């Protein structure tokens, strides 16, 4: 590796926009490392980070209000290029001597920006740009040294630039896909104006992570709780590539997994990739602990506590393990930092998302803590993990523990596993699996009358759930074809003895959540 992948970096200051993480993901997509910090960061931290460019994000506040967030003055004294997006443009304008006013008419949705002049931010782009607006305030007077480089019918300063100082402001959101050439604009800023190179690639991330793991753990042994989920699977592959047999994975089968999932994990990581795996069959222990518990939160906590106990017992058997590997990813770090300090820039701090016991005297190895989920998946592919595993629908941490409503019983889990497997199999067969964002089956602990042959019988009910969403914050129920739903229902009722009725959940989020519990 000729260059350190962290040498060239962009700093994104977060003013609270729902799109801020998307800005960071786009910069990474371009091939440049970036970090996301709170707007009220100290000057010393920015100096230490030493960015090649700074992006000021959007945000929900109004620059015209007292005490609304401002960029640290050092941002404009540092001599590096600055791009202000939406609120970021407004605070840039106001802080550098321009004027912002509250507009009578909000601009929300698509808009056409007429580009004027020759600005580096619009290099190689046409004179009219389709963009996505979402703002109430607008810049009415630009600071000295700036020129107007874009306008819409209702927004006189849709983009402004001080080419000499390399300050740019856009009133729209280049990070969202609705802005047709938004990625090109961000490339113009990051690669052209800031002069960064594309050093941040899947191959270089893997190379860097492996080198850092080797340096961190030396000849010590490492233990990892392998769940078969995306994050822990990618951590397993990275750490194994770095230290080989000095990694031991502990796979706890809690009896709440999908059909044949336990065997699939062992086949893939043990047989195919040759990792050391200890499989703990803890189904009885989990089910015993869950007896009589029907409250979803209580079930979640119980499952978490039992997992910690089992993992702790296994780790104590591995006397030489000095390090614990975890699948913490960057959004976990941002969320944890923000909730603890209000500032999202403590990327180096330990963030024990696994909730493992405090008295585990081990160092933490967290090779994914700089990565977004889409980056984790990409490096998983590069490491040889199958696409179907990396891109399958989300599965909750407590597993079927929150998909069996009410009390958990082995009978219910077994019925649900088989019904869910049929639903997922049919989605794949009909080429619908990748057209929905998440699909699963829920077990309802109610009996319903059914007719089989000449007899009536009372059996259980399951609900199918499929949603379409971009961010999982809001979701629409998926309009699956009636014929398809009919086929799934027939198969489940005929093939899973004990289920007599199948329903389809047509609730959106909000008001409903995606999972039932």
Curated annotation (Swiss-Prot):
Annotated ATP binding sites: 227-233
Which catalytic reaction applies to this protein? Answer: XMP + L-glutamine + ATP + H2O = GMP + L-glutamate + AMP + diphosphate + 2 H(+)
Which UniProt keywords are listed? ATP-binding, Glutamine amidotransferase, GMP biosynthesis, Ligase, Nucleotide-binding, Purine biosynthesis
What pathway is this protein said to act in by its record? Answer: Purine metabolism; GMP biosynthesis; GMP from XMP (L-Gln route): step 1/1
State the gene name recorded for this protein.
Answer: guaA
Q: Which InterPro entries does the record match to this protein?
A: Class_I_gatase-like, GATASE, GMP_synth_C, GMP_synth_GATase, GMP_synthase, GMPS_ATP_PPase_dom, NAD/GMP_synthase, Rossmann-like_a/b/a_fold
What is the designated name of this protein?
GMP synthase [glutamine-hydrolyzing]
What this chain does, per the entry, is described as:
Catalyzes the synthesis of GMP from XMP.
Task: Tell me which EC number(s) this protein carries.
Answer: 6.3.5.2
Question: In which organism is this protein found?
Answer: Vibrio vulnificus (strain CMCP6)
| Domain of life from the UniProt record | Bacteria
């Amino acid at each position: 590796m000729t260059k350190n992948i962290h040498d060239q970096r962009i700093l994104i200051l977060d003013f609270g926009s729902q799109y801020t993480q998307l800005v960071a993901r786009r910069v990474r997509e371009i091939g440049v490392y970036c970090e996301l910090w709170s707007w009220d960061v100290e000057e010393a931290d920015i100096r230490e980070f030493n960015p090649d460019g700074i992006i000021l994000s959007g945000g929900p506040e109004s620059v015209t209000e007292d005490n609304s967030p401002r960029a640290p003055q050092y941002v404009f004294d540092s001599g590096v290029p600055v791009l202000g997006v939406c609120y970021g443009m407004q605070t840039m304008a106001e802080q550098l001597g321009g004027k912002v006013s509250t507009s009578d008419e909000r601009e929300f949705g698509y808009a056409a920006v007429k580009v004027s002049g020759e600005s580096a931010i619009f290099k190689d782009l046409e004179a009219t740009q389709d963009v996505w607006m979402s703002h109430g305030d607008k810049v009415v007077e630009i600071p000295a040294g700036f020129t107007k480089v874009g306008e819409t019918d209702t927004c006189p300063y849709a983009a402004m630039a001080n080419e000499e100082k390399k300050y740019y402001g856009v009133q729209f959101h280049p990070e969202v896909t609705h802005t047709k050439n938004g990625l090109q604009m961000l490339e113009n800023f990051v690669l052209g104006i800031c002069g960064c190179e594309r050093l941040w690639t899947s191959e270089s991330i893997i190379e860097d992570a492996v080198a850092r793991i080797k340096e961190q753990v030396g000849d010590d042994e490492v233990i990892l709780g392998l769940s078969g989920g995306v994050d822990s699977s990618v951590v397993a592959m990275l750490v194994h590539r770095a230290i080989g047999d000095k990694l031991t994975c502990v796979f706890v089968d809690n009896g709440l997994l999908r059909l044949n999932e336990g065997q699939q994990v062992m086949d893939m990581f043990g047989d195919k990739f040759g990792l050391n795996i200890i499989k703990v069959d803890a189904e009885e222990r989990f089910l015993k602990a869950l007896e009589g518990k029907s409250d979803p939160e209580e079930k979640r906590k119980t499952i978490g506590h039992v997992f910690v106990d089992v993992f702790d017992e296994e780790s104590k058997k591995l006397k030489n393990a000095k390090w614990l590997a975890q699948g913490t990813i960057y959004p976990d770090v941002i969320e944890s930092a923000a909730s603890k300090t209000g500032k999202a820039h403590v990327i180096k701090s330990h963030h024990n998302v696994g909730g493992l016991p405090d008295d585990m005297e081990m160092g933490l190895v967290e090779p994914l803590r700089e990565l977004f989920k889409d980056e984790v998946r990409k490096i998983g592919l590069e490491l040889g993990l199958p696409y179907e595993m990396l891109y399958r629908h989300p599965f909750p941490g407590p597993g079927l523990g929150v998909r069996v409503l009410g009390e958990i019983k082995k009978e219910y889990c077994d019925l649900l596993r088989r019904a869910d497997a049929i639903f997922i199999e049919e989605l794949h067969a009909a080429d619908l699996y990748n057209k929905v964002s998440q699909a699963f089956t829920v077990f309802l602990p109610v009996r319903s009358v059914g007719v089989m042959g000449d007899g009536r019988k009372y059996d259980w009910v399951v609900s199918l759930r499929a949603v379409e969403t971009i961010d999982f914050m809001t979701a629409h129920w998926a309009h699956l074809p009636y014929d398809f739903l009919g086929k799934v229902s027939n198969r489940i009722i005929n093939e899973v003895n004990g289920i007599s009725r199948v329903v389809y959940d047509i609730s959106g989020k909000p008001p409903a959540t995606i999972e039932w519990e």
